[in-house]
Amino acid sequence: MIVVTGGAGFIGSNLVKQLNAQGRTDVVVIDDLTDGTKFVNLVDLTIADYMDKDEFQARIVSGDEFEEWDGGIEVIFHEGACSATTEWNGKFIMEVNYEYSKDLFHYCIEREIPFIYASSAATYGGRNDNFIEDPKFEQPLNVYGYSKQLFDQYVRRWMPEINSQVVGLKYFNVYGPREQHKGSMASVAFHLNTQVKKGENPKLFEGCDGFPNGGQMRDFIYVDDVCKVNLWFWLNPQHSGIFNCGTGRAEPFQNVAEAVIKHHQKGAIEYIPFPDHLKGRYQSFTQADMTKLRGVGYDAEFKTVAEGVADYMAWLNR
Protein backbone atom coordinates (compact mmCIF):
# COMPACT_ATOMS: atom_id res chain seq x y z
CA MET A 1 0.00 0.00 0.00
CA ILE A 2 1.01 3.57 -0.71
CA VAL A 3 0.33 5.83 2.27
CA VAL A 4 -0.35 9.54 1.72
CA THR A 5 -0.71 11.57 4.90
CA GLY A 6 -2.67 14.77 4.40
CA GLY A 7 -4.23 12.92 1.48
CA ALA A 8 -7.45 14.94 1.65
CA GLY A 9 -5.47 18.17 1.68
CA PHE A 10 -4.07 20.29 -1.13
CA ILE A 11 -0.83 18.63 -2.18
CA GLY A 12 -1.77 15.19 -0.83
CA SER A 13 -4.95 14.90 -2.90
CA ASN A 14 -3.12 16.01 -6.04
CA LEU A 15 -0.52 13.33 -5.34
CA VAL A 16 -3.27 10.70 -5.06
CA LYS A 17 -4.67 11.96 -8.36
CA GLN A 18 -1.30 11.46 -10.08
CA LEU A 19 -0.93 8.01 -8.52
CA ASN A 20 -4.38 7.10 -9.87
CA ALA A 21 -3.33 8.37 -13.30
CA GLN A 22 -0.42 5.92 -13.15
CA GLY A 23 -2.82 3.08 -12.39
CA ARG A 24 -2.18 2.96 -8.64
CA THR A 25 -5.34 2.70 -6.57
CA ASP A 26 -3.75 0.83 -3.65
CA VAL A 27 -3.54 4.12 -1.78
CA VAL A 28 -4.39 4.77 1.86
CA VAL A 29 -5.27 8.35 2.77
CA ILE A 30 -4.44 9.54 6.28
CA ASP A 31 -6.06 12.81 7.32
CA ASP A 32 -8.18 14.68 9.83
CA LEU A 33 -11.61 15.40 8.42
CA THR A 34 -12.73 17.59 11.32
CA ASP A 35 -12.98 20.17 8.54
CA GLY A 36 -15.53 18.16 6.59
CA THR A 37 -15.27 20.39 3.52
CA LYS A 38 -12.02 18.64 2.56
CA PHE A 39 -13.94 15.52 1.51
CA VAL A 40 -14.51 17.12 -1.91
CA ASN A 41 -10.81 16.60 -2.68
CA LEU A 42 -11.33 12.82 -2.47
CA VAL A 43 -14.62 12.43 -4.33
CA ASP A 44 -13.10 11.91 -7.78
CA LEU A 45 -10.17 9.79 -6.55
CA THR A 46 -9.90 6.03 -6.08
CA ILE A 47 -8.39 4.94 -2.78
CA ALA A 48 -8.23 1.62 -0.95
CA ASP A 49 -8.71 2.91 2.59
CA TYR A 50 -8.96 5.98 4.80
CA MET A 51 -7.69 6.32 8.36
CA ASP A 52 -7.79 9.18 10.83
CA LYS A 53 -4.37 10.69 11.52
CA ASP A 54 -4.54 10.00 15.27
CA GLU A 55 -5.40 6.32 14.83
CA PHE A 56 -2.59 5.99 12.27
CA GLN A 57 -0.09 7.62 14.62
CA ALA A 58 -1.11 5.37 17.52
CA ARG A 59 -0.65 2.27 15.37
CA ILE A 60 2.69 3.53 14.02
CA VAL A 61 3.97 4.16 17.56
CA SER A 62 2.83 0.68 18.67
CA GLY A 63 4.82 -0.91 15.82
CA ASP A 64 1.73 -2.21 13.99
CA GLU A 65 2.57 -3.83 10.62
CA PHE A 66 -0.87 -3.02 9.08
CA GLU A 67 -1.45 -6.59 7.96
CA GLU A 68 -4.94 -5.74 6.71
CA TRP A 69 -3.23 -3.77 3.94
CA ASP A 70 -1.97 -6.25 1.37
CA GLY A 71 1.82 -6.28 1.58
CA GLY A 72 1.96 -3.68 4.35
CA ILE A 73 3.32 -0.21 3.59
CA GLU A 74 5.34 0.29 0.40
CA VAL A 75 6.09 4.02 0.79
CA ILE A 76 4.91 6.94 2.93
CA PHE A 77 4.39 10.34 1.32
CA HIS A 78 4.09 12.58 4.37
CA GLU A 79 2.19 15.69 3.27
CA GLY A 80 0.08 16.11 6.41
CA ALA A 81 0.81 19.15 8.57
CA CYS A 82 -0.67 22.28 10.03
CA SER A 83 0.49 24.59 7.24
CA ALA A 84 -0.90 27.88 8.59
CA THR A 85 2.01 30.31 8.85
CA THR A 86 -0.36 32.49 10.92
CA GLU A 87 -0.85 29.82 13.63
CA TRP A 88 1.04 30.81 16.79
CA ASN A 89 0.04 27.91 19.08
CA GLY A 90 3.52 26.45 19.22
CA LYS A 91 2.57 23.41 21.31
CA PHE A 92 -0.04 22.38 18.72
CA ILE A 93 2.29 23.03 15.76
CA MET A 94 5.15 21.05 17.29
CA GLU A 95 2.91 18.08 18.07
CA VAL A 96 1.35 17.96 14.61
CA ASN A 97 4.36 18.89 12.48
CA TYR A 98 7.40 17.76 14.47
CA GLU A 99 6.49 14.90 16.82
CA TYR A 100 4.19 13.24 14.27
CA SER A 101 6.89 13.42 11.60
CA LYS A 102 9.47 11.87 13.95
CA ASP A 103 7.13 8.94 14.66
CA LEU A 104 6.65 8.21 10.95
CA PHE A 105 10.35 8.71 10.22
CA HIS A 106 11.50 6.15 12.80
CA TYR A 107 8.85 3.65 11.73
CA CYS A 108 10.08 3.91 8.13
CA ILE A 109 13.83 3.77 8.72
CA GLU A 110 13.47 0.76 11.04
CA ARG A 111 11.66 -1.14 8.26
CA GLU A 112 13.53 0.46 5.32
CA ILE A 113 10.32 1.92 3.89
CA PRO A 114 10.88 4.96 1.62
CA PHE A 115 9.85 8.15 3.45
CA ILE A 116 9.25 11.27 1.35
CA TYR A 117 8.10 14.26 3.35
CA ALA A 118 7.07 17.88 2.95
CA SER A 119 9.49 20.44 4.29
CA SER A 120 9.04 24.12 3.43
CA ALA A 121 10.75 27.21 2.07
CA ALA A 122 9.36 28.88 5.22
CA THR A 123 12.53 27.50 6.85
CA TYR A 124 14.51 30.18 4.97
CA GLY A 125 12.69 33.06 6.65
CA GLY A 126 12.96 36.58 5.31
CA ARG A 127 16.20 36.28 3.36
CA ASN A 128 16.44 37.63 -0.20
CA ASP A 129 19.17 35.36 -1.55
CA ASN A 130 20.94 32.02 -1.01
CA PHE A 131 17.89 29.77 -0.80
CA ILE A 132 20.26 26.84 -0.49
CA GLU A 133 19.60 23.57 1.39
CA ASP A 134 22.02 24.26 4.22
CA PRO A 135 21.23 25.02 7.90
CA LYS A 136 23.31 28.20 7.78
CA PHE A 137 20.76 29.76 5.42
CA GLU A 138 17.73 28.86 7.54
CA GLN A 139 16.11 31.43 9.82
CA PRO A 140 12.32 30.95 9.92
CA LEU A 141 10.00 33.84 10.75
CA ASN A 142 7.15 31.82 12.32
CA VAL A 143 6.59 28.71 14.41
CA TYR A 144 5.39 26.76 11.35
CA GLY A 145 8.72 27.39 9.63
CA TYR A 146 10.54 26.48 12.84
CA SER A 147 8.70 23.14 13.13
CA LYS A 148 9.83 22.30 9.59
CA GLN A 149 13.39 23.49 10.23
CA LEU A 150 13.68 21.42 13.39
CA PHE A 151 12.51 18.24 11.65
CA ASP A 152 14.95 18.84 8.78
CA GLN A 153 17.74 19.18 11.35
CA TYR A 154 16.59 15.97 13.05
CA VAL A 155 16.65 14.09 9.74
CA ARG A 156 20.09 15.47 8.86
CA ARG A 157 21.47 14.19 12.15
CA TRP A 158 20.22 10.67 11.42
CA MET A 159 21.12 10.59 7.72
CA PRO A 160 24.56 8.92 8.05
CA GLU A 161 22.99 5.90 9.80
CA ILE A 162 20.01 5.41 7.46
CA ASN A 163 19.95 2.55 4.93
CA SER A 164 16.67 3.43 3.19
CA GLN A 165 15.38 6.39 1.23
CA VAL A 166 14.50 9.57 3.14
CA VAL A 167 13.71 12.70 1.13
CA GLY A 168 12.61 16.11 2.40
CA LEU A 169 11.21 18.57 -0.14
CA LYS A 170 11.26 22.27 0.68
CA TYR A 171 8.11 23.45 -1.09
CA PHE A 172 8.16 27.04 -2.29
CA ASN A 173 4.90 28.85 -3.19
CA VAL A 174 2.61 26.06 -4.32
CA TYR A 175 -0.68 26.86 -6.06
CA GLY A 176 -3.27 24.92 -8.02
CA PRO A 177 -6.42 22.78 -7.79
CA ARG A 178 -7.83 21.40 -4.52
CA GLU A 179 -6.69 24.16 -2.16
CA GLN A 180 -10.11 25.76 -1.62
CA HIS A 181 -10.39 24.46 1.97
CA LYS A 182 -7.29 26.40 3.05
CA GLY A 183 -9.13 29.71 3.45
CA SER A 184 -6.71 32.58 4.04
CA MET A 185 -3.78 30.18 3.47
CA ALA A 186 -4.86 29.40 -0.11
CA SER A 187 -2.66 30.82 -2.87
CA VAL A 188 -2.77 34.36 -4.21
CA ALA A 189 -4.08 32.97 -7.51
CA PHE A 190 -7.07 31.44 -5.67
CA HIS A 191 -7.92 34.69 -3.86
CA LEU A 192 -7.52 36.90 -6.93
CA ASN A 193 -9.83 34.59 -8.88
CA THR A 194 -12.45 34.85 -6.11
CA GLN A 195 -12.20 38.66 -6.18
CA VAL A 196 -12.64 38.91 -9.95
CA LYS A 197 -15.59 36.48 -9.91
CA LYS A 198 -17.29 38.74 -7.35
CA GLY A 199 -16.91 41.66 -9.75
CA GLU A 200 -14.05 43.23 -7.78
CA ASN A 201 -10.60 44.18 -9.00
CA PRO A 202 -7.76 41.81 -8.05
CA LYS A 203 -5.90 43.30 -5.07
CA LEU A 204 -2.16 43.21 -4.42
CA PHE A 205 -0.05 44.79 -1.69
CA GLU A 206 1.58 48.15 -2.28
CA GLY A 207 5.35 48.20 -2.35
CA CYS A 208 7.32 47.44 0.81
CA ASP A 209 10.94 46.59 1.70
CA GLY A 210 12.19 48.21 -1.51
CA PHE A 211 9.78 46.36 -3.81
CA PRO A 212 7.38 48.28 -6.09
CA ASN A 213 3.59 47.88 -6.02
CA GLY A 214 2.76 44.23 -6.70
CA GLY A 215 6.46 43.65 -7.16
CA GLN A 216 7.15 41.30 -4.26
CA MET A 217 8.53 38.17 -5.90
CA ARG A 218 8.04 34.52 -5.09
CA ASP A 219 9.07 31.22 -6.58
CA PHE A 220 5.57 30.05 -7.56
CA ILE A 221 5.35 26.32 -8.34
CA TYR A 222 2.30 24.58 -9.80
CA VAL A 223 1.04 21.69 -7.67
CA ASP A 224 1.31 19.18 -10.55
CA ASP A 225 5.03 19.92 -10.74
CA VAL A 226 5.40 19.37 -6.98
CA CYS A 227 3.74 15.96 -7.28
CA LYS A 228 6.01 14.99 -10.18
CA VAL A 229 9.08 15.69 -8.02
CA ASN A 230 7.66 13.49 -5.22
CA LEU A 231 6.97 10.61 -7.59
CA TRP A 232 10.36 10.95 -9.32
CA PHE A 233 12.16 10.43 -6.01
CA TRP A 234 10.07 7.36 -5.24
CA LEU A 235 11.10 5.90 -8.61
CA ASN A 236 14.75 6.80 -7.90
CA PRO A 237 15.31 5.30 -4.44
CA GLN A 238 19.08 5.70 -4.64
CA HIS A 239 18.67 9.41 -3.84
CA SER A 240 18.11 10.71 -0.32
CA GLY A 241 18.47 14.15 1.22
CA ILE A 242 16.73 17.49 1.61
CA PHE A 243 15.98 19.31 -1.63
CA ASN A 244 14.39 22.56 -2.72
CA CYS A 245 11.13 22.10 -4.60
CA GLY A 246 10.60 25.30 -6.56
CA THR A 247 11.13 26.36 -10.16
CA GLY A 248 14.33 28.36 -9.75
CA ARG A 249 12.46 31.43 -11.03
CA ALA A 250 11.19 34.35 -8.95
CA GLU A 251 8.16 36.04 -10.50
CA PRO A 252 6.25 39.07 -9.18
CA PHE A 253 2.71 38.81 -7.80
CA GLN A 254 1.86 41.14 -10.68
CA ASN A 255 2.33 38.17 -13.07
CA VAL A 256 -0.21 36.12 -11.12
CA ALA A 257 -2.77 38.94 -11.23
CA GLU A 258 -2.21 39.48 -14.95
CA ALA A 259 -2.79 35.77 -15.66
CA VAL A 260 -6.06 35.88 -13.68
CA ILE A 261 -7.20 39.02 -15.53
CA LYS A 262 -6.28 37.43 -18.85
CA HIS A 263 -8.46 34.40 -18.11
CA HIS A 264 -11.49 36.46 -17.06
CA GLN A 265 -10.93 39.21 -19.63
CA LYS A 266 -11.83 41.81 -17.01
CA GLY A 267 -10.48 43.63 -13.96
CA ALA A 268 -7.51 45.88 -13.24
CA ILE A 269 -4.98 45.48 -10.45
CA GLU A 270 -5.77 47.50 -7.32
CA TYR A 271 -3.05 48.11 -4.72
CA ILE A 272 -3.82 47.99 -1.00
CA PRO A 273 -1.66 49.12 1.96
CA PHE A 274 0.85 46.60 3.25
CA PRO A 275 -0.50 45.26 6.59
CA ASP A 276 1.42 46.35 9.69
CA HIS A 277 1.15 42.89 11.30
CA LEU A 278 3.06 41.32 8.38
CA LYS A 279 5.95 43.78 8.36
CA GLY A 280 9.14 41.92 9.29
CA ARG A 281 7.29 38.59 9.08
CA TYR A 282 6.77 38.45 5.35
CA GLN A 283 8.84 36.81 2.63
CA SER A 284 9.09 39.52 -0.05
CA PHE A 285 11.37 37.43 -2.25
CA THR A 286 11.91 33.69 -2.69
CA GLN A 287 13.81 31.82 -5.38
CA ALA A 288 14.80 28.18 -5.03
CA ASP A 289 18.41 27.30 -5.71
CA MET A 290 17.94 24.28 -7.99
CA THR A 291 21.56 23.08 -8.05
CA LYS A 292 21.01 20.13 -5.70
CA LEU A 293 17.77 18.87 -7.31
CA ARG A 294 19.17 19.16 -10.83
CA GLY A 295 22.40 17.57 -9.60
CA VAL A 296 20.68 14.27 -8.78
CA GLY A 297 19.20 14.10 -12.27
CA TYR A 298 15.76 15.70 -12.02
CA ASP A 299 15.46 17.35 -15.43
CA ALA A 300 11.73 18.02 -15.96
CA GLU A 301 10.66 21.56 -16.82
CA PHE A 302 8.47 23.59 -14.45
CA LYS A 303 5.46 25.62 -15.55
CA THR A 304 5.80 29.41 -15.55
CA VAL A 305 3.23 31.48 -13.64
CA ALA A 306 1.51 32.34 -16.94
CA GLU A 307 1.22 28.63 -17.86
CA GLY A 308 0.32 27.31 -14.43
CA VAL A 309 -2.21 30.00 -13.54
CA ALA A 310 -3.89 29.59 -16.95
CA ASP A 311 -4.32 25.86 -16.21
CA TYR A 312 -5.55 26.60 -12.71
CA MET A 313 -8.06 29.23 -13.85
CA ALA A 314 -9.49 26.76 -16.36
CA TRP A 315 -9.92 24.22 -13.53
CA LEU A 316 -11.36 26.69 -10.99
CA ASN A 317 -13.86 28.14 -13.46
CA ARG A 318 -14.81 24.90 -15.16
Swiss-Prot record:
Pathway: Nucleotide-sugar biosynthesis; ADP-L-glycero-beta-D-manno-heptose biosynthesis; ADP-L-glycero-beta-D-manno-heptose from D-glycero-beta-D-manno-heptose 7-phosphate: step 4/4
Signal peptide interval: none
Free-text remark on how the cofactor is bound: Binds 1 NADP(+) per subunit.
E.C. code: 5.1.3.20
UniProt keyword terms in alphabetical order: Carbohydrate metabolism, Isomerase, NADP
GO biological process per UniProt: ADP-L-glycero-beta-D-manno-heptose biosynthetic process; carbohydrate metabolic process
Pfam families: Epimerase
Entries under InterPro entries matching the protein: Epimerase_deHydtase, Heptose_epim, NAD(P)-bd_dom_sf
Binding locations of NADP(+): 10-11, 31-32, 38, 53, 79-83, 148, 174, 182
Cofactor: NADP(+)
Active-site annotation: 144, 182
Catalytic activity entry: ADP-D-glycero-beta-D-manno-heptose = ADP-L-glycero-beta-D-manno-heptose
GO molecular function, one term: NADP binding
Enzyme type, top EC level: isomerase
Binding site for substrate: 173, 184, 191, 205-208, 218, 282
Domain note: Contains a large N-terminal NADP-binding domain, and a smaller C-terminal substrate-binding domain.
Purpose of the protein: Catalyzes the interconversion between ADP-D-glycero-beta-D-manno-heptose and ADP-L-glycero-beta-D-manno-heptose via an epimerization at carbon 6 of the heptose.
Quaternary data: Homopentamer.
Family membership: Belongs to the NAD(P)-dependent epimerase/dehydratase family. HldD subfamily.
HAMAP family: Heptose_epimerase (MF_01601)
Name used for this protein in its record: ADP-L-glycero-D-manno-heptose-6-epimerase
